[in-house]
């Protein structure tokens, strides 16, 4: 399948159409610098990270625990800490919270959480009250802990079966997983779909995001990478690609075979 990249012109942040700049102070938890990829001793543990613009942390309500209390979408905002947009909700009891922006939700729409609410985009309710075939996001794995699955921009899981105390869901990765029917989920798909198909426009945008350039191992010296060295444009000289530390790369399974959650996975991700 051919994926078309949409170039952003101009390259400034003025192209974020339809977002608001309002920032309620009680929902900002402080500043956060981009991670440098270092541990406590200053040693690089994750490569290609560093720099980046300072960020303000928004308090996102993944639990959606205002049961049977309706709220209205006041703003749709850009969040530098995620690809998805967020929207500010004003509840009738005076509470204000940020939630992930569901695709298709508009300013002025009303949302609500609870076990007996209607199946509407943005509403949150337990899986046992949701009909089969519904697209969902912000899925809980543990009841009451808050949504942990399908939270990226454009992500959506599908409810395909319910049996006993468990529901079977198809996750965005293609994984089929059992989740308790008492866990909550939000109806609809996460907004800002297609963000991964947009060209950033210039290299500087990548640096604003805290990502540094990636150098191929083939052009390094042998002391720096297993693929390095040779005369001229030489091949890697190995049966399969290796990581900088000599371990197999590109397809090596890294998940533990005896992980506790294996019993909840009907089919692993593709």
Curated annotation (Swiss-Prot):
GO cellular component: mitochondrial large ribosomal subunit; plastid
Cysteines joined through disulfide linkages: none
Region described as Disordered: 221-245
Major localization class: plastid
One function term, GO molecular function aspect: structural constituent of ribosome
Subcellular location: Plastid
Keyword Nucleotide-binding carried by entry: no
Record's keyword annotation contains Ribonucleoprotein: yes
Cited SMART domains: Ribosomal_L2, Ribosomal_L2_C
GO BP term, example: mitochondrial translation
Record family assignment: Belongs to the universal ribosomal protein uL2 family.
Official protein name in the record: Large ribosomal subunit protein uL2c
Source species of the chain: Cuscuta gronovii (Common dodder)
């Amino acid at each position: 399948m051919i994926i078309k990249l949409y170039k952003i012109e101009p390259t400034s942040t003025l192209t974020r159409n339809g977002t608001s700049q309002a920032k309620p102070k009680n929902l900002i938890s402080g500043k956060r610098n981009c991670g440098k990829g270092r541990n406590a001793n200053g040693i690089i543990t994750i490569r290609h990270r560093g720099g980046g613009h300072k960020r303000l942390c928004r308090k996102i309500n993944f639990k959606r625990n205002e049961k049977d209390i309706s709220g209205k979408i006041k703003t749709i905002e850009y969040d530098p800490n995620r690809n998805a947009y967020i929207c500010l909700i004003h509840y009738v009891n005076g509470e204000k919270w940020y939630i992930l922006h569901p695709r298709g939700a508009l300013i002025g729409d009303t949302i609500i959480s609870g076990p007996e609410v209607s199946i509407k985009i943005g509403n949150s309710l337990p899986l046992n009250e949701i009909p089969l075939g519904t697209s969902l996001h912000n899925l809980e794995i543990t009841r009451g802990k808050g949504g942990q699955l399908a939270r990226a921009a454009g992500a959506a899981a599908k409810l395909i079966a319910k049996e006993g105390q468990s529901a079977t869901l198809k996750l965005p990765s293609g994984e089929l997983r059992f989740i308790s029917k008492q866990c909550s989920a939000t109806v609809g798909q996460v907004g800002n779909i297609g963000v991964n198909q947009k060209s950033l426009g210039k290299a500087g945008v990548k640096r604003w995001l805290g990502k540094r350039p990636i150098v191929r191992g083939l052009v390094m010296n042998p002391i720096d990478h297993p693929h390095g060295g040779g005369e001229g444009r030489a091949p890697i000289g190995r049966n399969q690609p290796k990581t900088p530390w000599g371990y197999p790369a590109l397809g090596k399974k890294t998940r533990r075979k005896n992980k506790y959650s294996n019993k909840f996975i009907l089919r692993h991700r593709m």
